[in-house]
Amino acid sequence: MKGAQGEAQALAYLKQQGLTLVTQNYRCRSGEIDIIMRDHQELVFVEVKYRSGQQFGSAVEFFHPHKRRKFESAIQHYMLDNKLNPSLIAHRIDIVGIDVLSNNNDKISWLKYV
């Protein structure tokens, strides 16, 4: 499982937690936002990370500073494209990490407000 399947698993998990889907795979010249959800009145920009092995760390550890800058730039583009003022619209960045463990079970980690 990779890419689209990992995002589908993350989306299903977030829906179970009560969030509603706004859009998926928003792309712009700055990068991509995997999933955009709504949590009550707050927009949630979600980066999904999938790791099939933990020898180099867990999935959520792979949201490094360079990726974060690109992600934040993509959020700015999304806000501009949709005529949303980031100063007035509550929003946050979350990471959903999916780690496949040795027993082929998936461990989902959801970090809010990163």
From Swiss-Prot:
It comes from Pseudoalteromonas atlantica (strain T6c / ATCC BAA-1087). NCBIfam families: PRK12497.1-3, YraN family protein. It comes from the Bacteria. SUPFAM superfamilies: Restriction endonuclease-like. HAMAP family: UPF0102. GO terms for molecular function: nucleic acid binding. Belongs to the UPF0102 family. This is UPF0102 protein Patl_3694. InterPro entries: Restrct_endonuc-II-like, tRNA_endonuc-like_dom_sf, UPF0102_YraN-like. PANTHER family: UPF0102 PROTEIN YRAN (PTHR34039:SF1). It holds the Pfam family UPF0102.
